[in-house]
From Swiss-Prot:
It is found in: Cell membrane. Keywords: Cell membrane, Membrane, NAD, Quinone, Translocase, Transport. The keyword Transport applies. Residues 1-21 are annotated as: Disordered. One of its GO terms (cellular component) is plasma membrane. It comes from the Bacteria. InterPro entries: NADH_DH_suC, NADH_quin_OxRdtase_su_C/D-like, NADH_UbQ_OxRdtase_30kDa_su. Its EC number is 7.1.1.-. This is NADH-quinone oxidoreductase subunit C. SUPFAM superfamilies: Nqo5-like. HAMAP family: NDH1_NuoC (MF_01357). NDH-1 is composed of 14 different subunits. Subunits NuoB, C, D, E, F, and G constitute the peripheral sector of the complex.
Amino acid sequence: MTEPTGDQTPEIIGVRRGMFGAKGSGDTSGYGRLVRPVALPGGSPRPYGGYFDEVVDRLAEAVGDDAFTESIERVVIHRDELTLEVHRDRLVEVAQALRDDPALRFELCLGVSGVHYPDDTGRELHAAYPLMSITHNRRIRLEVAVPDDDPHIPSLFGVYPTVDWHERETYDFFGIIFDGHPSLTRIEMPDDWVGHPQRKDYPLGGIPVEYHGAEIPPPDQRRAYN
């Protein structure tokens, strides 16, 4: 069995300046001059290494070669992890095959993670699903990217019911709408909260918090590096 291979040349989608990417903050921390490219892992060539080739080949057999080509936008091996970047219209079909095929048997979805890449034009919002096969002791990840102006992804609740609260949290914090979810409401923020707090375009601010009788001002009103 070969070791997993590395990814190809990373895809540079932007440049981040300063420690937190903030501008005009009066930061005197010494990190204001940092310049760092924002990079996403590139697609990986064959052989992928480990059990990754077997998983990809079996998935292609399970859904059909034509459907596989239409479903999988890119195969990425990064940090010894297999990520299948899936077109959103095919997400449910791919997840069903990964769960039900005896040679795959990814019975468990460990959650949903949202990510916001403002510089990834047309693909600003990402949802990642780590999957685990208890039968075969394997792990992979599915990832779907959608644009800011059309943040819809089919819900995987019908395939993996355990994503119920995870999809609600991702909707709450990132604004990704999971079509078909039985009750897609906020789960941590108040129902009338404006915006989605973990997006990178969410303004720094907040509401005062009482703690042991003292009132702590929101972040934008605290003294910081000024």
